[in-house]
């Protein structure tokens, strides 16, 4: 996570910003909670979008501060960060990129958002999907979904319930998972085969079709990750 900062921003976080820009056509000003190393804030900066972030991990904040020229990343504990949501009067988007799944009480920050002056909510969350079953079966492979720091996973149904419960309108959604890449990773890392043909064969019969296979799950909204943008009704 802390390595290859520039590549991560370019390949992972710039697409998240571009998706946001496609959905919200007006000027965007971001309050980013749980900013980590500031990758999303840097991507915003590259796209000339103002962003202000808070992160409780001091080491990650130091990393992000070195990389940014305009957008700000501040080290602040979670309780004090929550107050910033209510106090904010400049931002029109609250972003929680890979954050809700780490919170013991995710509804708390959502309630603060509902009480705030911020109009839009942008989230990225892991989903209960094929990857979940793979991780449960290949317990020797590093888990992405069933990580010990994840308190819960979402589904299409739970996200729709979330929107209805909080009187939010879904104005943008991007379903894009890594289930089949996870399958490929699990098979490669768990194989006992020493045959030189093993990897070329699995590349031919799985990896070569990985995007097409993944698109089936993405289109049916049963993939491993979702990005959603909500607007207050």
Please annotate each region the language model reported.
Residues 98-102:
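A short His-aromatic
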Residues 158-174:
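A SAM-dependent methyltransferase catalytic signature shared across enzymes that methylate proteins
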Residues 124-152, 157-162, 186-188:
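Short, glycine-/aromatic-enriched active-site segment of Class I SAM-dependent methyltransferases
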Residues 1-89, 93-97, 107-111, 139, ...:
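Conserved N-terminal segment of class I S-adenosyl-L-methionine
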Residues 107-121:
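A short glycine-rich, Lys/Arg-flanked "PGG" loop and its adjoining helix->strand segment in the class I
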Residues 82, 104, 131, 181:
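Glycine/Thr-rich phosphate-binding loops of Rossmann-like dinucleotide-binding domains
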């Amino acid at each position: 996570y802390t390595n290859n900062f520039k590549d991560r921003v370019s390949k992972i976080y710039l697409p998240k910003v571009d998706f946001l820009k496609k959905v919200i056509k007006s000027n965007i000003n971001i309050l980013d909670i749980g900013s980590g190393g500031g990758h999303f804030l840097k991507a915003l900066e590259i796209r000339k979008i103002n962003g202000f972030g808070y992160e409780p991990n001091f080491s990650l904040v130091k990393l992000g501060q070195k990389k940014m020229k305009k957008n700000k990343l501040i080290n602040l504990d979670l309780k004090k960060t929550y107050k910033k949501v209510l106090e904010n009067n400049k931002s029109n988007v609250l972003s929680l990129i890979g954050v809700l799944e780490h919170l013991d009480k995710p509804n708390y920050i959502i309630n603060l958002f509902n009480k705030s002056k911020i109009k839009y909510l942008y989230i990225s969350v892991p989903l209960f999907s094929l990857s979940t079953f793979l991780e449960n079966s290949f317990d020797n492979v590093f888990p992405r979904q069933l990580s010990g720091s994840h308190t819960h996973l979402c589904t299409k149904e739970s996200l729709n319930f979330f929107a209805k419960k909080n009187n939010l309108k879904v104005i943008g959604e991007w379903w894009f998972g890594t289930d089949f890449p996870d399958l490929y990773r699990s098979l490669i890392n768990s194989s006992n085969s020493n045959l030189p043909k093993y990897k070329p064969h699995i590349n031919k019969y799985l990896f070569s079709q990985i995007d097409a296979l993944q698109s089936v799950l993405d289109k049916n909204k049963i993939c491993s990750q979702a990005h959603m943008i909500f607007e207050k009704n």
